[in-house]
Design a protein with these regions (language model features):
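Hydrophobic "lid"/C-terminal helical patch
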Residues: 33, 231, 269
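Peripheral terminal appendages
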Residues: 3, 38-44, 54-55, 235, ...
């Protein structure tokens, strides 16, 4: 296949910087991402951000079927060339973030994995779309900005620990499985990236995840405020009653959200929701 840069130029493609378009061209890196995702010939894969189709092709070489979602229709002539000859790839020019679960399931089915080089500006929203909503993949492998990846896997009481860390932990286990230098992209972005894999499973069966997510967002609503004050501002429970609940769980009344574990937040959510 011709060089991606030449294909883009010959098709008159102009990068839309508002969409965070940075494409991977190194075949070894592309194959490594697919390997780390654990995709095999039995898997249906959803890719977000087809881009120039380089990762799409690498996934298609291993997967049973690839549904790749792209919002920039200007890439169609590029993809007609880069994905030619592949009969197990379907490019869908739609925004996954705006699609209802029913519409998505009708296209991709209910058993799938997500593999993507995600545009940085939608990273958190996209990951949570596949965790919080009713369509759950068995695994999510994404290339994200390094500092975002660090937040995904952070430990309690660290600078990077936050609502997204807890929210991901509610649905599965995240780990950084690779690092990618910014020079591996075209055009070259300003920051390095990390490859994160989230293995999704019913980690907290029986837990009301909607209520727990409310408590998580509340705990980190204003990081400089104490957990007690944040909870009091959101839940219809008197401050002294909330304080008693925290004390019953051996949580310091001056504690902030970033010092708590997910298990503690689940306990708080359960008691405040009664």
């Amino acid at each position: 296949m011709r060089k991606i840069k030449d294909i883009l130029i010959d098709n008159g493609f102009r990068f839309n910087h508002n969409l965070g378009q940075n494409f991977i061209t190194d075949k070894n890196l592309l194959d490594k991402i697919v390997e780390l995702s654990g995709v095999d010939e039995n898997d249906v894969v959803v890719e977000i951000g087809t881009g120039a189709g380089t990762l799409t092709r690498a996934i298609a070489e291993k997967a049973k079927k690839v549904y790749s979602f792209e919002v920039d229709r200007a890439l169609k002539p590029v993809l007609d060339e880069t994905l030619s000859g592949l009969d197990n790839v379907e490019v869908i020019f739609k925004d996954v973030l705006k699609m209802k679960d029913k519409e998505l399931i009708e296209i991709i089915g209910e058993k799938f994995k997500v593999v993507a080089n995600i545009p940085y500006y939608i990273t958190t929203a996209l990951v949570m779309r596949f965790l919080e909503e009713g369509v759950h993949p068995s695994a999510i492998t994404v290339m994200v900005q390094k500092e975002v990846a660090d937040r995904f896997v952070a430990k309690p009481a660290t600078e990077d620990y936050g609502a997204i860390t807890m929210a991901i932990s509610l649905y599965g286990d995240a780990k950084i499985v690779g690092q990618v230098d910014k020079s591996m992209f075209y055009p070259v972005p300003k920051v390095d990236s990390s490859i994160v894999r989230i293995d999704v499973y019913d980690k907290y069966a029986g837990v009301n995840k909607k209520k727990v997510n409310k408590a998580i967002k509340c705990a980190f609503m204003m990081r400089r405020k104490t957990l007690l004050n944040n909870l009091t501002a959101v839940y219809p429970v008197q401050k002294d009653e909330t304080a008693k609940i925290l004390e019953s769980l051996n949580i310091d009344l001056k504690a902030r959200g970033e010092t708590l574990t997910l298990d503690q937040i689940i306990e708080i959510s359960d008691l405040l929701s009664k």
